[in-house]
Curated annotation (Swiss-Prot):
The gene is scpB. GO terms for biological process: cell division; chromosome separation; DNA replication. HAMAP family: ScpB. The keyword ATP-binding does not apply. It comes from Caldanaerobacter subterraneus subsp. tengcongensis (strain DSM 15242 / JCM 11007 / NBRC 100824 / MB4) (Thermoanaerobacter tengcongensis). Keywords: Cell cycle, Cell division, Chromosome partition, Cytoplasm. GO terms for cellular component: cytoplasm. Pfam families: SMC_ScpB. Participates in chromosomal partition during cell division. May act via the formation of a condensin-like complex containing Smc and ScpA that pull DNA away from mid-cell into both cell halves. Gene3D superfamilies: Winged helix-like DNA-binding domain superfamily/Winged helix DNA-binding domain. It is found in: Cytoplasm. This is Segregation and condensation protein B.
C-alpha cells in the first residue's frame, strides 16, 4: 500500500471534503507531508490524463471529476442528476421554474439567503440558462429553465408543473 493510495481510498470513501489534518492523523505523517503527497497525486492525474482530480481548498481536500470529463459524466449520469442536487439547488430550481424569467436578487429575496452556488450548479447541469437581462438598474441577468429541465422531470411544458398551494 502506498501513501498516495491510502489518500485516494479515504477521499473516495468519504465522498466529501476531508481535513488535511485528518489525513495526516490517519497516515501518521505531518500535514506538510500530506500536502506533498497531494501535490504528487495531482501531478500524476494531469500527466496521465486521469478522469479524477483532487481539489485543495484551505485546510480541506476533496476528490472530484476532472473538469475536462464533465460532458461525458453529465451525459452518462443525466438520469441521476437530481440525486446530486442539494436541497438549496432544488429550492432555487423550483423558484426559477415557477417565476421565470427571474433575477438572482429576486431568487435570494424569496429564499432569504445567497444563491450563487446553487445557481452555478444548475447552470453547470444545464437545468437553467441565462435568458436575458432585466430592464431594472444594473440590468441583472434573468434566469429561466431549459429544455433539459423538462426532460429531466419528464414533462413537456411548464404548464404541467403542479400548482403551488397557497400559504396561509
Amino acid at each position: 500500500m502506498t501513501q498516495e493510495g491510502k489518500i485516494e481510498a479515504i477521499l473516495f470513501a468519504a465522498g466529501q471534503a476531508v481535513k488535511i489534518r485528518t489525513l495526516a492523523e490517519a497516515l501518521e505523517v505531518t500535514e506538510e507531508e500530506v500536502r506533498e503527497l497531494l501535490k504528487r497525486l495531482k501531478e500524476e492525474y494531469v500527466k496521465n490524463h486521469r478522469g479524477i482530480d483532487i481539489v485543495i481548498f484551505e485546510d480541506k481536500v476533496e476528490m472530484c471529476t476532472n473538469d475536462s470529463y464533465g460532458d461525458i459524466v453529465r451525459k452518462a449520469l443525466k438520469m441521476e442528476i437530481t440525486q446530486g442536487l442539494s436541497q438549496a439547488a432544488l429550492e432555487v430550481l423550483a423558484i426559477i421554474a415557477y417565476n421565470q424569467p427571474i433575477t438572482k436578487a429576486e431568487i435570494e429575496r424569496i429564499r432569504g439567503v445567497r444563491s450563487d452556488k446553487p445557481i452555478n450548479t444548475l447552470l453547470e447541469y444545464n437545468l437553467i440558462k441565462e435568458s436575458g437581462r432585466a430592464s431594472s438598474p444594473g440590468r441583472p441577468i434573468l434566469y429561466s429553465t431549459t429544455e433539459d429541465f423538462l426532460k429531466y422531470f419528464g414533462i413537456s411544458s411548464l404548464k404541467e408543473l403542479p400548482e403551488i398551494e397557497p400559504t396561509s
